Regions:
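Mid-domain catalytic core of redox enzymes
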Residues: 3-115, 120, 141-145
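Conserved flavin/dinucleotide-binding core of flavoenzymes
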Residues: 82-183
Length: 183
């Protein structure tokens, strides 16, 4: 069979999005036996808070604490000078401070007052899907779905496609391994 993606036909398609969306998008293949299990897959979201902080030498700071709800500071200003506005004072840089799940702006600002490096709020965004949560059956479910879709030329890989807590390097490796074994 052929796959029609935005008006173009393909023999094979690799899906790298969220598996919850894939089972809703597929036409012509019966994936009903998987829909309930896929829908029940659990996850955590994060609220990413863009802010300025005191300059420091770190890339990431993991900060488990009972003093605030944040779990990590990503020191984005250290990744590239262009990540920092010219308007920032010399002793300041940009960062993203992460909170598990949704948190209000008021609670963010209140938490920032208790976080090291004197963070100053700029903006925030809640991302619903950040961390996939597995149970004892998740990997087998994904293997079974992959096996049943492979015969139709439909493949998938990625953090939320495979429902695996991949870091980017592992996600890229999984994609390259899939291409080597399937194409």
């Amino acid at each position: 069979g052929k796959w029609n993606v935005n008006g173009t036909s393909f023999d094979k398609v690799i899906f790298c999005g969220n598996i919850k969306d894939l089972v809703k998008m597929v036409d012509g293949i019966n994936v009903n036996e998987y829909k309930d299990s896929i829908e029940k897959l659990e996850y955590h979201g994060t609220t990413a808070v863009f802010c300025e902080i005191d300059k420091n030498p770190y890339s990431w700071i993991y900060q488990p604490s009972r003093k605030h709800e944040s779990h990590r500071i990503i020191c984005t200003g250290n990744f590239s000078k262009t990540n920092n506005s010219e308007d920032l004072p010399d002793n300041r840089m940009t960062a993203t401070i992460e909170f598990t799940d949704a948190i209000s702006k008021e609670d963010i600002i209140e938490n920032l007052s208790r976080i090291p490096l004197n963070p100053k709020y700029i903006d925030h965004k809640y991302n619903k899907y950040t961390y996939p949560i597995q149970d004892a059956n998740t990997r087998q479910l994904i293997r079974n779905l992959k096996s049943s879709l492979r015969v139709f030329g439909l493949y998938f890989t990625g953090r939320f496609a495979d429902w695996e807590y991949y870091n980017m390097d592992v996600a890229m490796g999984a994609a390259m391994d899939m291409v080597k074994s399937e194409f």
